[in-house]
């Protein structure tokens, strides 16, 4: 997984002191340019095949994520949470993951990456992510994120859950909001 490895390298680079980082700036920039070019070539050849690939091992595109989570529930996992960080680069996630691992060693991570729909617009990616639908299936609301709560709830109702067993929270930006989230996730009814 080139993106993950590159993210790890860039995160380590950003963790260096300025004197050590200065000597690597050009190399890191060249590495990023080369990986961008490789991705462009790969997308040109393979992107059209992605939407229809199977989801069994992990989601390939954002609209596969809900089905993948549903399969995990069907395999016996009683509670599943999906955390979405808008606009987060892989190297930024590496730093967050490392910090969380230090602070909460019992917390486990199940990480994978998937492709967004092109062009990568927030409203398209988020609606695909929460609904499990392809963009043409939500064309009427493609320019907004407001349908997300209903799409998330509808997806899980279609999988057999009741509306009061599904939780959706958006816009958690402050630490003081975490207590409310924790209370919601701790509800016995929430799946």
Feature-to-residue mapping (PLM):
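A short acidic-Thr-Gly-centered motif at the start of a beta-strand
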Residues: 60-79
């Amino acid at each position: 997984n080139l993106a993950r490895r590159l993210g790890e390298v860039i995160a380590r680079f950003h963790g260096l002191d300025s004197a050590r980082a200065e000597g690597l700036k050009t190399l890191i920039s060249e590495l990023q340019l080369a990986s961008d070019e490789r991705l462009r070539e790969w997308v040109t050849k393979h992107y059209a095949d992605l939407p229809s690939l199977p989801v069994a091992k992990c989601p390939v595109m954002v609209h596969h994520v809900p089905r993948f989570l549903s399969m995990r529930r069907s395999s016996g996992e009683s509670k599943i949470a999906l955390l979405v960080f808008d606009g987060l680069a892989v190297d930024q996630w590496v730093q967050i993951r490392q910090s969380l691992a230090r602070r909460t060693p019992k917390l486990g991570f199940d990480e994978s990456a998937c492709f967004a729909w092109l062009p990568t617009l927030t409203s398209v990616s988020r609606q695909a992510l929460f609904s499990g639908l392809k963009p043409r299936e939500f064309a009427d609301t493609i320019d907004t994120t407001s349908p997300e709560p209903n799409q998330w709830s509808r997806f899980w109702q279609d999988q057999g859950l009741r509306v009061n067993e599904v939780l959706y929270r958006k816009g958690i930006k402050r630490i003081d909001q975490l207590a409310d989230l924790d209370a919601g996730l701790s509800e016995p009814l929430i799946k």
